[in-house]
Amino acid sequence: MKILIKYKNIYYTLILIAASLFFPLFYGHKGILPIDSFLIFNGGYNIFNGYYPFKDYWSITGPLLDYIQYFFFIIGKLSWISYVAHAAVFNLILCLFSFYFFLKIELKKEYSFLYALGISILGYGQTGTPFMDQHAFIFSYLSIGFLLLGIKFKKNQYWFFSSFLLIFSFFSKQIPSSYLAIFLFFFSFVYLFFYKKKFANILSFYIGGIFSLFIFATIFVLNKIPFGNFFTQYILYPLTIGDDRFERLSLSINNTVLQFKFLYLAIIPYLAIFYRSRTRK
């Protein structure tokens, strides 16, 4: 029993590794969506055959996923298991980061484990194959996580990785990283106003973003991808899609409340726990 307590984190980590790999690998072989499930597969296949996004084929989705899938095809050959493994690895990253993030902010080990286990199921378990929405969320999630650690511990490396991964999120999908980048831009000035001696934190944040942009700019230059093509396909054209969706947006009770009633109900226990903990203090 003493050994179990001593190595509890190791046991929890091994269980989380197994769970986060199992769910995408299992459900990735259970079914497909005719278009969405093959989108990143085709992108990785194109690069595998010497074609590049924006230059040789039209792309309005994140080019980063195509390149990552290309590397998975190199490592595991051109196969479906290499495709599903892509999703499984990112599910693993999401799960383990969550676990150690919760531990870092001093959440109980048992709670940290259970929350991370739930994340391993909800992460890539729902699709089983790589998709830009999941990747964009994961990178943004990691970015926010590192930012919170940076604020709590005042360490420059956390600030650096926050913006670094935010750029990765943008090149996975334009949102939510664009909204998050705007918010963090203004937040950095507010933070600097209250913590004038922590200029190195903000400097690290911007250096991380610039370094990340430099990596993607280098890829574009090496592959001779025209910037005009990228701007048209990845920035301008998606804006037209957004305009159309915004015009059809309905703010009815059904769309804003009833469709999300179970999410609202799930929040109630957490609010009750939060209220009780505050009253005890």
Regions found by a protein language model. Give the residues of each.
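Membrane-interface alpha helices of multi-pass inner-membrane proteins
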Residues: S120, Y124, Y158-P176, L180-F185
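Transmembrane-helix signature of polytopic, membrane-embedded enzymes
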Residues: S98-L122, N156-Q157
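Hydrophobic alpha-helical membrane-interfacial segments at the cytosolic entry of transmembrane helices
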Residues: Y11-S20, K196-L222, Q259-I268
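Transmembrane-helix motifs of polytopic, lipid-linked glycan transferases
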Residues: A85-L107, L142
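Membrane-interface transmembrane helices that cradle and orient dolichyl/undecaprenyl
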Residues: K104-E106, Y141-F160, S169, Y195-K197, ...
